[in-house]
Amino acid sequence: MALLELERISAQYPGAETPVLADINLSLGPRQLLVALGPSGSGKTSLLNLIAGFVAPSGGRITLDGVPVQGPGAERGVVFQDDALLPWQNVLGNVAFGLELAGVPRAEREAKAREMLALVDLDGFGERRIWQLSGGQKQRVGLARALAADPRVLLMDEPFGALDAFTREQMQELLLQVWQRTAKPVFLITHDIEEAVFLASELVLLAPNPGRVVERLQLDFGQRYAAGESARAIKSDPAFIETREHVLARVFSQRQSLQERA
């Protein structure tokens, strides 16, 4: 049964000649890691913003647990590419910030924040200042903060896009570990093909102008990692390589088609 449903979603910005998104139908179910991948102009970030409730769709309906999404809410935790942390707060204060706004007592919110920091392998980092953290550590704090409110679904907007290649791989593996431990449904957008293939239980390919779904792939590489298989073994598997090359060819063909129309 789907927790999150998008039915015939379209989006068009004021003054734009063409829609950003057209006729998008998606569902996110329990324990699913849904990844949206597409070239620039395919509406990935716009799609996430609609689900988060930051903007309203021009047409269609978005529901969470059968209730229409009509604005931001704590039941949808968001992790951004820019860590968006509060520099005047320490790590613990950042993770507990949403709980503080919700009126959770201090002892309870700090205990929850420490639990989430342990989940993302930052046990003992609570008193550190944000400027003392590496890029990967900041993203771990952002993930812990999003999880602290116990959201129904986790939304991730190219969360590893600004990280170096080594740290990016570490964060991909951490996300799969957290996904397995928490059983939280995740909707993630990325422009990185290998990342998308590795993480997704379902991969949705978007084409641009307007953004629309052109292919859906059911994948198990992330589940294999969560079950204990090494990332190196998975990424050298001929099945992984074949899938990656198939997705790469689809994305390149979309870009070429876009250039020919320009």
UniProtKB/Swiss-Prot annotation:
Reactions mediated catalytically:
taurine(out) + ATP + H2O = taurine(in) + ADP + phosphate + H(+)
Which residue intervals define the domain ABC transporter in the entry?
A: 4-233
Positions annotated to bind ATP: G38, P39, S40, G41, S42, G43, K44, T45
Which PROSITE patterns does the entry link to? ABC_TRANSPORTER_1 (PS00211), ABC_TRANSPORTER_2 (PS50893), TAUB (PS51250)
Q: Where are the transmembrane segments?
A: none
Q: Which SMART domains match?
A: AAA
Any one GO CC term of the record? plasma membrane
Give the EC number(s) listed in the UniProt record. 7.6.2.7
The record describes its membrane topology as: Peripheral membrane protein
What InterPro entries does the annotation carry? Answer: AAA+_ATPase, ABC_transporter-like_ATP-bd, ABC_transporter-like_CS, ABC_transporter_ATP-bind, P-loop_NTPase
Record keyword Ribonucleoprotein present:
no
Which keywords does this chain's UniProt record carry?
A: ATP-binding, Cell inner membrane, Cell membrane, Membrane, Nucleotide-binding, Translocase, Transport
Q: Does the keyword Membrane apply?
A: yes
Annotated CDD domains: ABC_NrtD_SsuB_transporters
Q: Which GO terms describe its molecular function?
A: ABC-type taurine transporter transporter activity; ATP binding; ATP hydrolysis activity
Q: Where is this protein localized, as stated in its record?
A: Cell inner membrane
- Chain's role: Part of the ABC transporter complex TauABC involved in taurine import. Responsible for energy coupling to the transport system.
The record's comment on protein family reads: Belongs to the ABC transporter superfamily. Taurine importer (TC 3.A.1.17.1) family.
Q: Whom does it interact with, and what assembly results?
A: The complex is composed of two ATP-binding proteins (TauB), two transmembrane proteins (TauC) and a solute-binding protein (TauA).
Q: What is this protein called?
A: Taurine import ATP-binding protein TauB
